[in-house]
Amino acid sequence: MSSSHEANATVRSSKQQPPPRSLFSVPAPIKQLFDQFPLLTYPVNDLPQRAPQHRNAHVLYVFTTDKGAIGGAPSYNPACLKWQAYLKFSKIPFQTASANNHASPSGSLPFMLPASPDPYKETQPVPSGKLQRWALNNSESPIEEPGDSRYEAYHSLLDHRIRRAWLYTIYLSQNSTTIAEPLYILPTSRNSFVRLTISRELRLAAEQELLKYSSIINDETLYNQADEAFAALETLLGKDKWFFGAETPGVFDASVFAYTHLLLEARLGKGWADTRLRDALMARKRLVTHRDRILAEYFAEAA
């Protein structure tokens, strides 16, 4: 898929004509599954019931399995994986915990629950939009981002071209039954009607997001644009170890890794039925090496 990227949700009377369904009105269990959307603030929820009351470790709540949380495995959601990787780059020790958007105080994942050894001191969760600043303030080795004028232009390739192709390939292609279903739909409920409803909502949300940019959803166009974006990112990386020639990986490296790792993960969900986007990335050997380097240096314990 999982970004992000606001207007408050309004409670409406059941007698009122419901507004046209849009990306910003999906049910709570699936809101903001996609990286950076929907752009909606939901009422603050209580912390997950499994949240520890006496903690001496930071806990990052992400989309993951219970087994993955124990081993610190990379999240299967791009928005979560981005910040999971960035916190590792920042050398901040933390644990991961499995959650969903409905369990998040802000309505979206990821969020951090800082360590609190004092049982009488309440700690405030840190939403994804504030994680970079929190990391800078809490890391013994804060990451200095490169002041490159090209940064925003290249980051837009991730936020637009690659993200759109990701949405299509996960939620609208054949991968919807082999990846989206086992990761985002089946875990939500055992009720077949609920699962069917969530599946339809996910497809509709992805379609409406893609229709913001074109009146027709053309898979070949989306994949071609993503391929061009991968080519541009590979050229940008060149022979450097990290993007923009940095000495250590930063948030841009984390943003790229969030997509490249998941696309290169052959065992994601039940496997890839439509491999076109994955194949386009696999042809970019420097991006593959960049992903493998991060996986080996920062996620070795989860291998």
Predicted regions: what they are:
Residues P93, D118, L236-K239, A300:
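Short amphipathic alpha-helical interaction elements and helix-loop-helix interfaces
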Residues D292-A303:
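C-terminal helix/juxtamembrane-tail motif
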Residues N77, L277-V288:
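Short, conserved loop/turn and helix-capping segments at secondary-structure boundaries
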Residues R164-A280:
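GST-like fold's C-terminal all-alpha helical module
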Residues M1-S3, A302-A303:
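A positional/structural detector of protein chain ends, strongest at the extreme C-terminus
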Residues H58, L81, A85, S149-E152, ...:
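Amphipathic alpha-helical interface elements that mediate macromolecular binding in regulatory proteins
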Residues S2-L196:
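GST-like domain detector, emphasizing the conserved glutathione-binding G-site
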